[in-house]
């Protein structure tokens, strides 16, 4: 849906601006870019927004290996997968941070998975009425969801 795409785009723009301003090495990608999570060729996903800091993972055809951060914007058809199956896949693959933007409930669920495949996973829940800190940048980068919500119609 349009709202889903608008929210994903605004998040990607905010991340890109932060990275560019800081001269960072990570790159922001958006669906429909394929991400091959493991070596068996069977686990191909297309996250809504994701960050890759190791550019050797970019084969030109797909991203090969776990992104550093993944953001999924839920829609009625993806909601169950975003909270269930995908979380498990991202933890197993070594994603460091996973956000679920739950538009219906106006929440941003942040899983800080760390670098130990979720062994010491932290979970935080934010409202979509303020800033949400990006953990892989130690909270220095913040996504202003109030601004995003105000710029997106039909939310």
Predicted regions, residues:
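N-terminal, charged amphipathic alpha-helical interaction modules
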Residues: 1-2
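C-terminal interaction segment
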Residues: 5, 9, 13-18, 27, ...
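A glycine-rich, hydrophobic loop/mini-helix early in the fold
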Residues: 23-25
């Amino acid at each position: 849906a349009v709202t889903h795409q608008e929210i994903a785009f605004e998040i990607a723009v905010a991340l890109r601006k932060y990275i560019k301003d800081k001269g960072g090495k990570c790159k922001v990608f958006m669906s429909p870019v394929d991400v091959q999570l493991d070596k068996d060729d069977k686990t191909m996903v297309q996250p809504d927004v994701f960050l890759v800091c190791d550019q050797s993972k970019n084969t030109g055809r797909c991203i090969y290996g776990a992104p550093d951060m993944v953001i999924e914007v839920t829609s009625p058809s993806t909601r169950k997968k975003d909270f269930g199956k995908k979380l498990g896949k991202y933890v197993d693959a070594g994603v460091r941070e996973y956000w679920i933007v739950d538009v219906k409930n106006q929440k941003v669920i942040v899983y800080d998975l760390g670098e130990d495949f979720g062994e010491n996973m932290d979970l935080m829940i934010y409202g979509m009425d303020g800033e949400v800190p990006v953990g892989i940048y130690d909270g220095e980068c913040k996504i202003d969801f109030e601004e995003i919500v105000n710029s997106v119609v039909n939310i």
